[in-house]
């Protein structure tokens, strides 16, 4: 019997990066996985990797109508849910004095508002004993230039983890967060010139206590632990950051 045989898992932001790696881990272990993303072509490419036990839903993580529709789709396909990984999010940087209202609203919309209402919409489908995992960030506890809004949106999510853990405790649903540090997801390679990417990676490596970048697989392993293995943990944040938040 495979590790996750019969489990039903929903992953927002599951079409690439950490979300897709986690989806692969669960699908390879026998779970049925439903992933979301904003781009149909990216979702279709993810499905090719995940196989016939996966479902892909185009959904805007900050749009309440899409979130409500997602809950209906999950109910139709799965009935109930054993684990919810709320991973959809965006990163943007700008100095404090040039940050716009549009940027502020976009980051809080996807990184904070979206996860809140996603958990609210899917909570009725969560089985007793299930796990919710939210993706925060090492920037919750670090003061970094040009990341004031992004940091705040993720810090709010960290606080939300505690409160949702308390509110869902009577239903025996655990809520925890995974906090990635500098992770090599391939996103930089696909979006920036190679020389720029290598300079950025060198900086991340040199400033990290472990002198390297993390891998998506390392974050996915932490997600799996929080979703299923951490049966006596709720309201906590699990760092996968090479010691950046502690050393």
Regions found by a protein language model. Give the residues of each.
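Short C-terminal tail/terminal secondary-structure segment
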Residues: 142, 234-247
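Substrate-binding pocket helix/loop in short-chain dehydrogenase/reductase
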Residues: 95-96, 100-108, 204
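Active-site helix of classical SDR
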Residues: 119, 153, 161
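Short, small/polar-rich loop/turn modules that mediate ligand/substrate recognition or access, typified
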Residues: 85, 169, 174, 234-235
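Alpha-helical segment proximal to the catalytic Tyr-Lys
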Residues: 124, 166-170
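Conserved glycine-rich cofactor-binding loop
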Residues: 15-17
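C-terminal substrate-recognition "lid" of short-chain dehydrogenase/reductases
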Residues: 125, 212-240
